[in-house]
Amino acid sequence: YFYGLSSHENVEIKLYNKANPLKPWKMMGRMHDKYLIADGKTYILGGRNTYNYFLGDFPGHKNFDRDVLVVCDEPQKDNSVNQLWNYFETIWEQEDCRYFHNSKKLADRQSVKKAVLELQEGYQQYFEVNKEKICDTDYADETFETEKITLLSNPIHTQAKEPVVWYQLGELMKNAKERVKIHTPYIICNDMMYN
């Protein structure tokens, strides 16, 4: 499916730090970010993986991930949508990011054509079932205004990283007037962090 998607003229896919058994010291440098930026004004970020177990109706265990939708009609320079875009660009341009493939000829392969058709049919089925949610949603009605959104991340290089997010959270918490509310699918705290 990645070949099918990346064969589209408007799609580029890069791999972050592709696993290389000849460089085992880099294998722990993984990227687990999940975000989608649309039109430079809206983004979704969260913890949802793109496997059926995490999406849709999967029998058995239900997994409830937290996604955040941010809508900004007129983003200013220091707005979080621009912060996220700059973060994306920094990762995209890293030496450790390489194109999934560079061959336009792949689109002519029968297996890729089949994958493209399956993706198109899957989207059409999804659209038919969810048409009302997709077309008739007033996002202004379903969101609430914030004074500020602060996006945090640990370093994005592939070497060992300092855990700077906890320090950044601590600095933000020092500025709280009444309480602190953290919305994240990722945080796992130890005893020291709870105190």
Predicted regions and their residues:
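Charged, low-complexity intrinsically disordered terminal segments
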Residues: 1-14, 18-34, 38-195
